[in-house]
């Protein structure tokens, strides 16, 4: 079985988001009068803290906090003029709930693995605070994350990230994106392609057509379409409905990478949107995992 592979960090690795990537995403949101907390960020190394500190007045931030896990953890606090450093008992992102309680938004690159990303997002959604974090692109294939996105609790930011700097100076290529509960408005995907059965083959194990690129989604097609995982960075819920994740698609007996299953919202009159129960799907296609 062919799987999408990503170069995630080992437990001891540190991934640093590049300043250029941060500066392309942060200005898309309103930070006026916000208390911002970077809770996985060593201010001596983190470009998140550096960016917010250097753009404090331009963004209209009220206060900036940062903590990070270390043997001698410190709480950094910046008010636009002075920076205060206070020893704390723990720099773990789960430990400093008192700061989470007073902040308005949490912005960071959490420990870089799909498992930690799930834990972190759960914590953020439970906090009731705004958040903007960097995490692996393919966590969308996790059932809980898919459900968060499908329900509108979790959104994908405006830009993508493909490379990170490691502490040793090397570069890690890890397809990633911004995950947030801020409002995000993506433009519709407009293409000049129409459906052609020779261009858009059907899966052997599910009644849907395959579209290998988001910019080739056929116009006017009312059925279910399988698109690459990276489609989620272009997803606009006003244009498409997320039907599920096809984890083991096959075309003409050949296994291909996982697909997100989508359907246009503006289905032709008289055509019903396809919704399949999980039990009936499992009965028919036992080798395919589909989320609802």
Task: Please give the residue ranges for each predicted region.
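Class I S-adenosyl-L-methionine-dependent methyltransferase catalytic core
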Residues: 1-292
């Amino acid at each position: 079985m062919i799987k999408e592979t990503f170069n995630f960090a080992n437990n001891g690795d540190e991934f640093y988001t590049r300043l250029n990537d941060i500066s392309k995403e942060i200005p898309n949101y309103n930070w006026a009068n916000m208390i911002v907390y970077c809770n996985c960020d060593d201010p001596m190394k983190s470009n998140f803290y550096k960016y917010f500190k250097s753009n404090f007045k331009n963004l209209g931030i009220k206060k900036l906090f940062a903590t990070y896990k270390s043997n001698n953890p410190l709480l950094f606090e910046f008010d636009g003029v002075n920076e205060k450093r206070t020893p704390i008992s723990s720099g773990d992102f789960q430990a400093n709930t008192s700061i989470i309680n007073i902040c308005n938004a949490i912005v960071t690159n959490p420990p870089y693995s799909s498992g930690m990303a799930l834990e972190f997002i759960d914590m953020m959604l439970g906090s009731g605070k705004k958040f903007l974090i960097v995490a692996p692109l393919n966590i969308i294939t996790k059932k809980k994350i898919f459900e968060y996105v499908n329900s509108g609790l979790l959104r994908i930011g405006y830009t993508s990230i493909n490379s990170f700097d490691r502490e040793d100076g090397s570069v890690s290529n890890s397809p990633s994106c911004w995950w947030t509960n801020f409002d995000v408005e993506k433009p519709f995907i407009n293409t000049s392609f129409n459906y052609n059965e020779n261009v858009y083959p059907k899966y052997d194990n599910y009644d849907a057509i395959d579209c290998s690129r988001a910019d080739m989604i056929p116009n006017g097609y009312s059925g279910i379409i399988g698109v690459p995982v990276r489609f989620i960075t272009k997803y606009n819920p006003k244009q498409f409905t997320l039907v599920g994740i096809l984890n083991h698609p096959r075309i003409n007996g050949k296994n291909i990478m996982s697909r997100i299953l989508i359907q246009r919202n503006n289905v032709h009159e008289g055509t019903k949107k396809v919704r399949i129960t999980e039990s009936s799907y499992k009965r028919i296609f036992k080798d395919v995992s589909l989320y609802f």
